[in-house]
Regions:
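Short acidic catalytic loops
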Residues: 34-48
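Substrate-binding/active-site clefts of carbohydrate-active enzymes
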Residues: 1-37, 52-69
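Residue-level detector of conserved catalytic or cofactor/ligand-binding positions
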Residues: 168-176
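Gly/Ser/Thr/Ala-enriched C-terminal appendages of enzymes
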Residues: 147, 159-162, 167-169
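Histidine-centered active-site/metal-ligand motif
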Residues: 45, 146, 171
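Active-site-proximal helices and loops of the catalytic beta/alpha 8
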Residues: 1-2, 53-152, 156-158
Length: 177
């Protein structure tokens, strides 16, 4: 999932200007259907609503793309018109290069972001994913995502010392294997 050469998924890019012409009707219909099925919807790659990276179809890898502006608040407003009481969680993991405007859009919508425990543990005591560094209670904490190793595999690879340390950070005192 993570590569020095960037990512080239081969997926088509949304034609945001065309979607805006009809008030993001496709997105509204999709979110309305999800709202009928689920109490909570997670929007993956939320940062792309603000700014996204476009890789040319003929490029060998993801290094030769360019940044484009996403629809931002116009899209989130359109979604909010149709979801009713359904809650939205946004995947806002920024890595080493946060996209300006993402936190601002989250604040406008009130939609919580996420933290990933597997990203928390290491030598950096200021790591934003460490539970004692959470500065906002409007968030959801996951052990990992589809981009991570399974939690079983993650813990299996830890030494007893590392496991005890990790569990102490989340207030679990007795490791079991």
């Amino acid at each position: 999932a993570f590569s020095e050469n960037g990512q080239k998924w081969g997926s088509p890019v949304y034609n945001w200007s065309r979607m805006e012409e009809d008030g993001f009707a496709w997105w509204q219909a999709r979110m309305l259907e999800h709202a009928k099925l689920f109490d909570v919807i997670r929007l993956d790659h939320f940062a792309a609503i603000v700014k996204y990276y476009v890789v040319p179809n003929k490029a060998e890898d993801g290094r030769s793309g360019k940044w484009s502006r996403g629809p931002g608040k116009k899209l989130t407003d359109a979604i909010e018109k149709v979801i009713g009481d359904t809650h939205i969680i946004v995947e806002d993991i920024a890595g080493k290069s946060p996209i300006p405007g993402v936190k601002k859009l989250m604040a406008r919508t009130g939609w919580p972001g996420i933290k990933i425990l597997m990203f928390a543990f290491g030598d950096d005591t200021a790591n934003e994913h460490l539970p004692h560094n959470y500065t906002d209670c409007n968030l959801v904490v996951y052990a990992g995502t589809h981009d991570n190793e399974t939690i079983v595999g993650y813990f299996r690879d830890k030494t007893d010392y590392e496991l005890a340390y990790l569990l102490s950070l989340i207030h679990i005192s007795e490791p079991t294997r």
